[in-house]
Amino acid sequence: MNFKISGHHLDITPPLREYVETKLERIVRHFDQVIGVSVLLSVDNHKEKDRRQYAEINLHLKGKDIFVEAHHEDLYAAIDALVDKLDRQVIRYKDRVQGHDREAVKYQMAAAQMQQ
């Protein structure tokens, strides 16, 4: 798995990198076909304080790319919200992919039973 983390107007410190990596382990545990991950953390000068810290992620899966973004006044809270959103999308995608495979097997078994 390729992992890239970058920051705009922000230095990526080792504790921040480790925090992001530990949060993303949850995603890999749910779905093991992750090809690459690119994370962008940014600090902007918005008038609204709750939108100053920005985090986005591009998750490259086998057959699909997922993009998620989150804003918050605390960068760690933005990362938490980002991973929660990403987790929901990955689980939904995994269910969709596995659901199609199960339906195909179910129809094949039903067709085989009808031929007998």
Swiss-Prot record:
Function text: During stationary phase, promotes and stabilizes dimerization of 70S ribosomes by the ribosome modulation factor (RMF), leading to the formation of inactive 100S ribosomes.
Keywords, in A-Z order: Translation regulation
Subunit comment: Associates exclusively with 100S ribosomes, which are dimers of 70S ribosomes.
Tree of life domain: Bacteria
Gene: hpf
GO terms for cellular component: cytosolic small ribosomal subunit
Organism per entry: Cupriavidus necator (strain ATCC 17699 / DSM 428 / KCTC 22496 / NCIMB 10442 / H16 / Stanier 337)
Protein name: Ribosome hibernation promoting factor
Similarity comment: family membership: Belongs to the HPF/YfiA ribosome-associated protein family. Short HPF subfamily.
InterPro entries in the record: HPF/YfiA_ribosome-assoc, RHF-like, RHF/RaiA
GO MF assignments: ribosomal small subunit binding
Matching PANTHER family: 30S RIBOSOMAL PROTEIN (PTHR33231:SF1)
BP term (GO), one: negative regulation of translational elongation
Presence of the UniProt keyword Methyltransferase in the record: no
